[in-house]
Amino acid sequence: MSDNLALHGTTILCLKKNEEIIIAADGQVSHGNTILKSTARKLRTIANNKIIAGFAGSTADGLALFEKLEVKIEQHKHNLLRSAVELAKDWRSDKYLRRLEAMMIVADRNHILILTGNGDVVEPENNVAAIGSGGLFALSAARALMSYENNLTAEEIALKSMNIAADLCVFSNHNIIMEKVV
């Protein structure tokens, strides 16, 4: 696929405030300068909502990674950190997986992790992580709101941050889906 027709962007945001963990995603799928779908679901729950994952990048690649992550989570008895590290190792070393163009945020009660195709497993500072074309907008908004708006819940911060990202990123929209880690 040529660069000008590549599948573009999304915004995935995950944050933890007062022991509440929320992952939010917009619903837009773009191809070049065309919106293909505005109601895509980019979040998946695993292990009876105890683990939630969101992806940015190629839809098919993101879904393939979800499947691989689910297998790892079952193999490692719902240990998210170990499962993420094992997936990242496979992603980096496997010829097929190495070609996948996606990033993931995964979270459980104890961890928020960013997984990349380079084999990175990053636990972000400040209990906030974001990926995708609108990720930096959402991350900045969430960090500011968490610092200065103590009366807002995690869900309210996520929604406000995602809406700011959608206002600024042409590859993200206001069709926000949120999931809560239980």
Curated annotation (Swiss-Prot):
Activity regulation remarks: Allosterically activated by HslU binding.
Highest rank taxon of the organism: Bacteria
Subcellular location: Cytoplasm
Single GO term (MF): threonine-type endopeptidase activity
GO terms for cellular component: HslUV protease complex; proteasome core complex
Keyword terms of this UniProt record: Allosteric enzyme, Cytoplasm, Hydrolase, Metal-binding, Protease, Sodium, Threonine protease
Chemical reaction(s) catalysed: ATP-dependent cleavage of peptide bonds with broad specificity
Pfam families: Proteasome (PF00227)
Binding site for Na(+): A166, C169, S172
Residues the record marks as active site: T10
Transmembrane segments: none
GO biological process terms, semicolon-separated: proteolysis involved in protein catabolic process
EC assignment: 3.4.25.2
UniProt record similarity statement: Belongs to the peptidase T1B family. HslV subfamily.
Subunit structure: A double ring-shaped homohexamer of HslV is capped on each side by a ring-shaped HslU homohexamer. The assembly of the HslU/HslV complex is dependent on binding of ATP.
Protein name listed in UniProt: ATP-dependent protease subunit HslV
Organism: Rickettsia felis (strain ATCC VR-1525 / URRWXCal2)
